[in-house]
Design a protein with these regions (language model features):
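Expand to "…catalyze enediolate/carbanion chemistry for C-C bond making/breaking, isomerization
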Residues: 1-177
Length: 177
């Protein structure tokens, strides 16, 4: 797994991500990256926003997993959780750890919440029902459901299954309730 730690690495992120079929994930190392820029890391992370979004975009375009940098303050669990939330919102699918006490909060924060899973299941079910009826357009509540929304819902459900949060055959159970 390559770790991008320089301005040049950020600019060549897609090239690195696609350099070999063995590359399945790519991370950013923000301590080295910010040192390369000659700036300090800050809590609001403005100094690394470009690099982080560039890494996520390169990874997604290459079909690999983007991994965010470690959170250096091992005593600040609340700060870690906020950082992980921000990482997830940017599109990262994981984060490095520098201390064992960071593992559980990171896993919990990247796992989909119950409400996210339930919403994703409703979207998938509504889309399947519409397909079965031959409808090209479907809505759930006041929101239109299109292919990107369904894809995002499928990703959420797949992760929930992989983490053991729901059963693999959830759709059989939920459609008969």
């Amino acid at each position: 797994m390559p770790i991008i730690e320089s301005a040049l690495g950020v600019e060549k992120a897609f090239e690195i991500a696609t350099a070999s079929q063995n590359v399945v994930a790519m991370a950013i190392g923000l301590e080295d990256y910010t040192a390369d820029l000659g700036v300090s890391r800050t809590k609001d992370a403005k100094e690394s926003l470009y690099a982080r979004t560039r890494i996520v975009n390169a990874c997604k375009a290459a079909g690999i997993q983007p991994i965010d940098s470690v959170f250096s303050d091992v005593a600040d669990e609340e700060g870690l959780r906020i950082n992980v939330k921000n990482s997830k919102e940017l599109g990262f699918e994981g984060m490095g750890c520098i201390h064992p006490r960071q593992i559980a909060p990171i896993h919990e924060s990247f796992a989909p919440e119950k409400s996210e899973i339930e919403k994703a299941q409703k979207i998938i079910n509504a889309f399947k029902e519409a397909e079965e009826k031959g409808l090209g357009v479907v809505s759930l509540g006041t929101k239109m459901i299109d292919a990107p929304v369904v894809k995002r819902a499928q990703t959420t459900v797949k992760l929930a299954i992989e983490l053991g949060l729901i059963e693999k055959d959830w759709y059989l159970v939920s459609s008969h309730q």
